[in-house]
C-alpha cells in the first residue's frame, strides 16, 4: 500500500473489527450506506488491490438497502455465520482453525494491551486481532514508539492472523448466502495481504 496513511489503515481495521464483533444496529446500518462511507470507499478503491473487494462490498450494501427487514436479516446472517456450530459457519476464532489461541494474548502483552471486559468473547476472536492491528498502525503514525519495534509486532500479528484468515474467508463465502459478510471478509483478506506485503 502506498497511498493510504498508517492512520487510514488503522481506521479500516478498527471499522472492520467493529463490524465483525457484533450485529449491526440501525445507526451502523444507516452509516454504511451513507455518502460519507461512499467517500471512504472511493479512497480505498484508489488502491488497486482493494478495488474489486470494495466494489463487491458496495454492491452488497446497495442490495442491503432494499432488503426487507435489513437489520433483522443481517442479524440472522451474523448469528448463523459467527455464533453457531462450525458445521455451516465461519467461526471468528483462531482456535476454530486449529491455531494457538494463546498467540494473540502474547502479542497483546507485547503491545502493552489487554482485552476489554466489555467484549465478552475469547481473546482469539478476529476483532481482537483487528483492534491490535489498528492500534499498531495508529502507533506507527504517532511516532512515539520506535517504528522498527511496532513494525515487528505488526508483522507477527499479520502472520498469526494469516494462518487462519483465508479459511475463515472461504467459509464466509461458502455459507453467507446474502453475501454481506462474505464481501466484508474478502476486503479484510485483501487488506491483510497488502499490509503483510508492505514490509
From Swiss-Prot:
A Pfam family that the UniProt record links to this protein: Nitrate_red_del
Keyword Phosphoprotein annotated: no
GO cellular component: cytoplasm
Record flagged with keyword Cytoplasm: yes
Keyword terms: Chaperone, Cytoplasm
InterPro entries: Chaperone_TorD, DMSO/NO3_reduct_chaperone, HscB_C_sf, TorD-like_sf, TorD/DmsD_chaperones
One record GO biological process: protein folding
Location of this chain's protein in the cell: Cytoplasm
Role: Involved in the biogenesis of TorA. Acts on TorA before the insertion of the molybdenum cofactor and, as a result, probably favors a conformation of the apoenzyme that is competent for acquiring the cofactor.
Family stated for the protein in its record: Belongs to the TorD/DmsD family. TorD subfamily.
Name of this protein: Chaperone protein TorD
Organism: Escherichia coli (strain K12 / DH10B)
Gene: torD
Amino acid at each position: 500500500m502506498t497511498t493510504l496513511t498508517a492512520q487510514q489503515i488503522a481506521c479500516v481495521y478498527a471499522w472492520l473489527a467493529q463490524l465483525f464483533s457484533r450485529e449491526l444496529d440501525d445507526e451502523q446500518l444507516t452509516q454504511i450506506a451513507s455518502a460519507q462511507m461512499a467517500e471512504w470507499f472511493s479512497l480505498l478503491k484508489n488502491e488497486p488491490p482493494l478495488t474489486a473487494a470494495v466494489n463487491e462490498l458496495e454492491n452488497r450494501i446497495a442490495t442491503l438497502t432494499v432488503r426487507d427487514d435489513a437489520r433483522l436479516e443481517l442479524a440472522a446472517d451474523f448469528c448463523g455465520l459467527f455464533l453457531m456450530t462450525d458445521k455451516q459457519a465461519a467461526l471468528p476464532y483462531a482456535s476454530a482453525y486449529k491455531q494457538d489461541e494463546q498467540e494473540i494474548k502474547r502479542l497483546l502483552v507485547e503491545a502493552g494491551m489487554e482485552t476489554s471486559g466489555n467484549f465478552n468473547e475469547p481473546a482469539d476472536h478476529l476483532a481482537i486481532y483487528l483492534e491490535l492491528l489498528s492500534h499498531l498502525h495508529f502507533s506507527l503514525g504517532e511516532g512515539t514508539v520506535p517504528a522498527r519495534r511496532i513494525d515487528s509486532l505488526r508483522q507477527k500479528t499479520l502472520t498469526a492472523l494469516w494462518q487462519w484468515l483465508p479459511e475463515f474467508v472461504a467459509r464466509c463465502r461458502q455459507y453467507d448466502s446474502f453475501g454481506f459478510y462474505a464481501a466484508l471478509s474478502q476486503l479484510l483478506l485483501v487488506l491483510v495481504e497488502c499490509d503483510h506485503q508492505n514490509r
